Amino acid sequence: MSPGIGLMKRRLEKEKDAIALAVSGISKKYNIQPENIKTLETKYDSDAGDWYVALGWDDLRAIVKMDSVLAIITEIKEI
C-alpha cells in the first residue's frame, strides 16, 4: 500500500525547482535557449500536489503542469 500524496516526499519541494523543470521542458520542446524564457507566474495546488508555471518567450506563452512527487511534466499548454 502506498502513502497518500500528503505523506510522500516531494521531489519538487520549492518554487525554484518547479521553474527549473518547466524552463527545461519548454527549452527542449520549442528549441529555445533557457535565458530567453521568462517566468510569468507560479502556483502550487496543494490538493493535487501539482505545480503550475506560466512561461513566456518571444510572442508565445505556455502553462506547464508538473507532478511534484514524480518531478515530471504532465502537460504543456500554449495560451
What are these regions, as identified by a protein language model?
Residues 32-79:
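Exposed beta-strand-loop-beta-strand "reactive/processing" segments of non-cytosolic proteins
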